[in-house]
Every structure is written in structure tokens, then in C-alpha cells.
Amino acid sequence: MIVCIAEKPSVAKDIARIIGATPARDGYMEGNGYQVTWTFGHLCELKEPDDYTPMWKRWSLSALPMIPQRFGIKLINDEGIRKQFNTIERLMQAADSIINCGDAGQEGELIQRWVMQKAQAKCPVKRLWISSMTDEAIKQGFQELKDQNEYQSLYLAGLSRAIGDWILGMNATRLYTLKYGQNRQVLSIGRVQTPTLALIVNRQKEIDNFVSEPYWVLATIYRDTQFTATSGKFTSKEEGEKAFSTIAGKPFTVTDVSKKKGNEAPPHLYDLTSLQVDCNKKFAYSADITLKLIQSLYEKKYTTYPRVDTQFLTDDIYPKCPQILNGVSQAKIMSQQKYLPLIQQLAATGKKLPKSKKVFDNSKVTDHHAIIPTGVPPTGLTDMEANVYDLIAKRFISVFYPDCKFSTTTVLGEVINEDGPKPEKIEFKVSGKEILEPGWRVVYAKDAKNSDDDDATDNANGNDGGNGAKKEVVEERTLPSFVKGESGEHTPTLTEKWTTPPKYYTEATLLRAMETAGKFVEDEELRAALKENGIGRPSSRAGIIETLFKRHYIKRQRKNLMATPTGIELIDTIHEELLKSCELTGIWEKKLRDIEHKTYDPADFINGLKEQINQIVNDVLSDNSARHVAITTEEDLKKKEPSKKTAPKKSPKQDDTAEKTPKNGDTAEKTESRSPKLPADDSIIGKTCPICGQGTIIKGKTAYGCSNWKGGCQFRLPFSQQ
């Protein structure tokens, strides 16, 4: 008899149906020479400290560090688990062979290996390795069963991870609880959770300690187009006023007009982290909710394996893509075949689907490829599932569209003042981006407006970046036709602005920070290079964030993640950089990947951790300070904090924003750019912005803002003023 063991009953049921083992028994199904049984995720776990010796049952500093000579596993103490395990054990001990049908990943390998070890299975074991749960994929997987030994390094990496987490977590948690917890709370320390908490705490301190500084921006309006001085911002008002007086009343001359064509490739396919990031940005789904939704879509056969960290497909997927697209075209979301026109447009070209190296690259795929639709048309999706499927389907469709072609126009100008003994010149610049052929952007045409509005409302809510330093974004707009050498009158302005603090983390930005070990990069290629040293795995990051919530170390305020007093004091108490450093934790992750790739010895990894925990214990025990960590309760989290002003602190005698504009062509008059009194209700939506006079008023999440926020307009009217 061949025993198949799946990771959950629903998967076992699908497998049993396909291989003809449909008659149900108690805890398994049987037929056609197969017995198909299942686990419920983890049935086994590493032993607790007191399972090794009674001396480790009581929490005591003198017992630390606790390092067993040999790590063992035990059955999780649950009646349902024990009953199912007894069934599995009986089947395995009588089996001729076993097929490991666990989740095709590191954790899935560990789950099933531990069960087989505990059941003392002695027969040969094959491995079912598939990336989707469609009938076709399962049939093909059974035709191409692998020898389990091919996945030994995957198991060793998972085992090393589990043992490493035990060594650090068990010892450091007891150490810090006993030393700093005042016998009133458990201070949980984890290899991934503590550096993640440190990211949030450090960002919060940056914000709390941020001192807003004024700066001045010189610009001028020529032919209804705003040019900005290339000299950058002025840090003193005097410098700005001097530059302003230099150009006031003098003609503006266009010195150069250049056009450059460019291509913008479609965005990469989704891995788990990028999907969680987009779901948080677009729908405010937590990482944990997104993981559950995509897992559900996978189990319903609508999308491929979700716990992946690659955004590429293998070459063997390419021949299947037309069939997948055909299935996606039949999908009905909210009773509409919304993907059919997009896929018909692809077919109308009469060409084969393009095979780009940015999509298909065997060298960028290890266990599983990027998340894509399976081609099975979804039915009965919840609204939340439909949102996630929509992202995946559109991303898959878009990679077969041509690049977006655009033209960037850059116009340079100058104002020269020859009144003094030496001519003074100030140069200006403006850029505009014109879409020539939208290419893949047509897939997102209906989403574009909503996306822009989301960004605009973030600005209206006061989330306009950090430290005044932003990546230059060329606005999509068609500039007037300028000619080199033309000259005329212009309207200069000197605007006072304030540097702004960094933003609080959201789950989206925190996931990105975890992925790149705290390094903040926007470039997709560079981010991919940093992934190997990220903290945590794609599949575990959502759980880590949820753990921080459960421990009352962090809390949510709208979409922002903020540390509680307990979380802040815990990080302040930890002086051992190893425990809270993203970089060092990232190196651990790299070593675990190397174990998986057979280039690093698991024994060296564990021995290194043993040395490190010994050092940490010695350092903490030698601390003679009276430090302790505050307690944050559930009641504390429910308390409503007093509202804080969104504007950063400013020195007295300074205005929010001030502009200088020429009057009668030869003098300048100072004007205040404060928000005029307006009704704080929806009646102002669509009206001309009272600050810049160019944009219109839009509604954000907590305030009204200006549609010209990208152009620098700072108008903001909170709802609270109603």
C-alpha cells in the first residue's frame, strides 16, 4: 500500500479524488492501492526545556544558557492531533512506500519530515512537488515524483531555522524577562521579531525627535508653466530674498529645449511580499489577511503556490500561458468578464506572446515561480478574494503587453540681472512626461485615477515624505511648445517650506524594510539583490507582525504602525546589537539559504548561535543597572490618545508658508499663504485651490487637499475643523 500524506484535509481530498482513493475512512481515504491521510499543519514541535531536564522547568538565571546536547521533537499536546497522528503512525508503519505531499516549501518539508520521524517510518519516501493545486498539476506531479533525498538540504535549512529560533528565543526571552520584567510580564525576544520591532521603534524616535527646519524654494511662472531654480533650496531666508530680488522685473529666457524618448517595462510579477505590499496600499489589508486570502485562492485552484520570493517564471511555463490567459478571460468578477477585452486586445495583434527575460528566467527561480493565475476561472469569490485575484490577474496580463513608450521634455531657462558691476544669473528647469504609446498601462487605465487619488489623499493627510528629500518624479503632462532663445515676462515666487519628518511605518513599508534588511530601495533590481539578506521569510513576516501586536509591542493608528511604551523600552533595554540588528539577522537568513543550497554546513550555523547566546547571557548578567521595561495592557491600547497637531514644531515669528511675488513689475510684496476660511464640508470639493490657484480641492481620508499636491501645493484642511 502507498501512503500519501498531505498538509491539510482539503488538499488530501483533492489528491485522493485524482488518484482514485475516494472511500473515506477514519482519518484517511483509501482506494486504488493508495491511502491518503493528512496533518493539520504542524503536528510536532521541538521539545520544551523541561522535556530535557527538570532543572529547566523553573525560570532561573543560573540555568542559562539552556542548550540541549541533542534536540528532539514531540507531539503537540492536543487530543485531535494525537488521534490523527495515531492514524498516520499506523498507516506508515504498514506502508510499502510513502509519498510526501506536503506544502512544497521549507516549512512544508519540515512539517512532514517530523511526522514521519515521530511515526518511525522505515519505507522508501517519494516527494510530490507542485506549484499549483489544479487537477493537471497534481496529475503531472504524480507522474514526476521525486526522491525525498533531493530535498534533504531544504529540510536541514528548516531544521536549522527551528533550532536557531529555539536557542535564541528560549534563552533570550527567559534572560530578559527575569532581568528586566519585574516579575510582572514575559519579555518575548525573537530572531526576527526583535529586529522588526527595532525598525518601528527607531523610526518612531526619528519622528519624535525631528526638528522641522525652514527652507525656501525659488520658482517662476513663465507662459503658465512653473519653472524651479536649479540651485535647489535655500536654507536661509536672506539668501532666498537675494536671489528673488536678482530676478524680479528681469526677463526670462529659454536656454535649452530637449526631448528624450524612453520605455517603461511592465512591473514584475508578484511574489508574496510585493502582493502583501500592494494589498496594504490599495485595500489596507494586513500582511496576515493577505496571506490567508492568497492561500485560500491557492487551495481553490485559482492561483499558484503563494509563499514565494521570486517574481519570475520558468521557461516551461511559457507554453502554458495562452491557456492560462484563456481561462482568465472567462473569469467573472462582480458578474463582469473584465479581463476579456484586455486579453482579446493581446490576441488581436496576431503575434505570439512575447517571452521576455524580465518574466521568464530559470536562474531566478528555485523551488517555485512567481504567483500567477492557474487559468481556472474563479467563482464564488468574496470581495476581498476578488480584490487579490484582480491584482494577480492584471499583473499577469500586463507582462505580455508592450513597454509603455513616453517622451520626456526638459526645458531650461535663465534670468540675468546686469544692473550690478557683475552680471548675476539664475537658472531654472521644468520637465514634463508625455505618454506616446501606453502599452501595458492600458491594463491599469481604470485604476490610474484611483491610484493618483490615493497618493493625493496621503498628501492631504499630511504624509508627504521625510526630511524634505524626495526622489524627483517627472509629472505626466504636456508642456507648451517652447523655443530656445524666446524671452518674456515671468512671475517669480519665493516659497517658504518646512522639512518634514519620516513617515511612520505601514505594513506595506515595513514589509519592504524587512525584505531588504532595513535598507530602503525603490529600484526593483537592487531590491532583488538585497532579498537574500532580508529578515524573515516571505511566509513568516505576516506572522511576525501579528506577534508584535499580540505582545502589545506595537499598535495601529489608521494604517500607521506605532510602538507602545513596552516596545520602546524593550528595544532601549537591549544593548546586544545581535538581537536587534537587521543586518546581522539578514546574514543569518543568508546562511540558512546557503544551507538550503548546500553551500553552508548546518552544524556551523548552530555552533555559531551557541557561541552568540553564551555571549549575550554573559553580557546581560553583568549588567548592574536597575533598568526595567514598562507594561502595556489591553486597556492602555484602548485609551484614546489626545490629538496631536500634524504640523511639526516651528520656531516663533515664522509663518507656515510665505511667498514673495512682484508687484507692478519692479517691487516685491510679502503675502501670507495661509488657508483662507472655507467650509470644512464636501461643498468645497472641486473648487479652485485658494493657495496655488492651479489645482482643485479633493477629499482625503482625514482632510481636504489640493489636486496639485505633486506640484508642491501644501493646502490642507482637516475634517476636524468642521
Q: Model-flagged regions — what are they?
A:
Residues 1-166, 170, 448-449:
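Intrinsically disordered, low-complexity regulatory segments
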Residues 2-3, 118, 287-288, 309-722:
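Basic, low-complexity terminal or inter-domain segments flanking catalytic cores
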Residues 23-28, 148-153, 174-178, 205-210, ...:
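Active-site phosphate-binding and catalytic loops of NTP-dependent enzymes
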Residues 72-98, 199-200, 278-279, 391-397, ...:
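Phosphate-interacting basic helix/loop segments used at nucleotide- and nucleic-acid interfaces
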Residues 86, 93, 135-216, 220-222, ...:
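C-terminal or mid-to-C-terminal helical accessory/interaction module adjacent to the motor/catalytic core
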Residues 237-270, 276:
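Metal- or metallocofactor-binding catalytic centers and their adjacent structured scaffolds
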Residues 282-286:
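A conserved hydrophobic secondary-structure block that centers on an alpha-helix together
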